[in-house]
Amino acid sequence: MATSSMKSIPMAIPSFSMCHKLELLKEGKTRDVPKAEEDEGLSCEFQEMLDSLPKERGWRTRYLYLFQGFWCQAKEIQAIMSFQKHFQSLENDVVLATIPKSGTTWLKALTFTILNRHRFDPVASSTNHPLFTSNPHDLVPFFEYKLYANGDVPDLSGLASPRTFATHLPFGSLKETIEKPGVKVVYLCRNPFDTFISSWHYTNNIKSESVSPVLLDQAFDLYCRGVIGFGPFWEHMLGYWRESLKRPEKVFFLRYEDLKDDIETNLKRLATFLELPFTEEEERKGVVKAIAELCSFENLKKLEVNKSNKSIKNFENRFLFRKGEVSDWVNYLSPSQVERLSALVDDKLGGSGLTFRLS
């Protein structure tokens, strides 16, 4: 995939930290102003907008804000606003959507390899395949963490078709930008129990130094109240689930557990949805199996690029790969927590037809 060039939106208004310092100077105070990393580069105008939003304790930053009906960080809101204002979809665009820690890295690797298998043969691949030198997040960039981060407006004109992007946005906040005919959305979700445990581990690994670690019980309470990045998780899942039932040609819904159970069958389904089905000859040559093995959690985790490099917002790639298992939650949740989350899932997802395998 070609690398897009970036240009920043000029900031005519001083940063929030500078505004705050000016206010203190007017009051005759000259001490240094404590400043969190998440406030860097935010304008006074933007900070005023943030101050008007409901907020809760964050997982890896001080706060999460309720924006467009979901919870996210300040810098994410800045990027989302730029994306929604400037992104222009094209026919044949592919958008991969997930809630955090539900198999995003795996989905990116699988989709990239399916779409580019005629350029990079997975059967004959040695170290020349892009996955050996690039993390999947570099091959399929996020709207909110890469392309439009910090309010940037990227030039996407040089990207080869089909352009492939990723997002954690709920469907309601993505819908208007992907309505053009031919744009396809692939959604991957994971059972809420494992998603929670994976999120808790990951956020404590990458949290800001100014934020204390979130304890398991604290995180669990926030999660059950819907306060997690891009949550509530049930609304995120149901948004894509219902759209996939309404428009299966537009939105393809996958479960992490189904991929673990039968990766090859689901790869065939995914390729067909992307209008690049595997031929009989490809199946005889073992292309489907080769893609599954190349993109497997075990293989990706052992690659040097995923051990030492950084991709998303300078977070170390190694934190993206922990266990990749189903039912790891049994090692962490108490009986009362299992009961609470089970009741919540039944209440929020009951009657929708959306169910999960937990073990």
From Swiss-Prot:
GO terms for cellular component: cytoplasm. GO terms for biological process: jasmonic acid metabolic process; response to jasmonic acid. Expressed in leaves. The active site is at H168. Induction: Up-regulated by methyljasmonate, 12 hydroxyjasmonate and 12-oxo-phytodienoic acid, but not by hormones. Its main location: cytoplasm. One of its GO terms (molecular function) is hydroxyjasmonate sulfotransferase activity. Signal peptide: none annotated. Optimum pH is 7.5. Active in a broad range pH. Keywords: Cytoplasm, Transferase. Pfam families: Sulfotransfer_1. It is found in: Cytoplasm. It catalyses: a 12-hydroxyjasmonate + 3'-phosphoadenylyl sulfate = a 12-sulfojasmonate + adenosine 3',5'-bisphosphate + H(+). PANTHER family: SULFOTRANSFERASE SULT (PTHR11783). Sulfotransferase that utilizes 3'-phospho-5'-adenylyl sulfate (PAPS) as sulfonate donor to specifically catalyze the sulfate conjugation of hydroxyjasmonates, with a preference for 12-hydroxyjasmonate over 11-hydroxyjasmonate. No activity with 12-hydroxyjasmonic acid methyl ester, cucurbic acid, 7-iso-cucurbic acid, 6-epi-cucurbic acid, 6-epi-7-iso-cucurbic acid and their methyl esters, prostaglandin E2, arachidonyl alcohol and 11-eicosenol. This is Cytosolic sulfotransferase 15. It comes from Arabidopsis thaliana.
